């Protein structure tokens, strides 16, 4: 009965309250996508466990948080900012909150790290990594090889030259690191926090296409045709630029 009530709460479109969420050791759990705001009475992620936050969730309030060793809260990239408020809790060494951007594709540019606002109140932490780096740019496309030339013939004569290879495409630009606001008590030790807000790496340059081989020579009864030259290789594309780094605003209360 309790499990049924919990499932009903999780999938309610309203703000949720008094829900208990537990992620098993080495387990992965994805929150539902039906609500934009989630209130959790107790959230426990065991060692090496991962809780996935969907893109449509914009606010999560946790009354009691327990992050085990190397546990992770992974927040999907999105245009909307995400706010996390924790009233009390314990965070073990190696735990992290990840809000990295997405890698680019040939059709879509890389996505930046998600804008975050995090408030930790009565929280004891051994260490915490906040990773909100930008997504890496997609690599440039490889240029096509040139077609081979036609061999010489006794009927049509001279061999044809190989076709030139195409140039490689340019890599896409990496996305920016996130904009982060941290609200921490005055006695919270800043040295337990590690924040990574680097911009994403630029995409690799596309490789050049090779030139096609020239047509071969042909020996005929009355004469011989000469072979033709090879096509020229294309040019290697340019590597994409790295994305700009994000920034962090630390507020003590």
Question: Whereabouts are the PLM-identified features?
Answer:
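N-terminal domain-start segments of secreted/luminal proteins
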Residues: 17-93
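Active-site scaffold segments
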Residues: 179-183
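A short, structured loop/turn motif at beta-sheet edges
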Residues: 90-92, 119-128, 184-192
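Sec-dependent signal peptide recognition
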Residues: 1-7
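N-terminal signal peptide c-region/cleavage motif recognized by signal peptidases
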Residues: 12-14
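Glycine-centered low-complexity coil/loop motifs and glycine-rich tracts
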Residues: 50-55, 72-81, 95-114, 128-178, ...
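Structural detector for internal amphipathic alpha-helices that build alpha-solenoid repeat scaffolds
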Residues: 58, 116-119
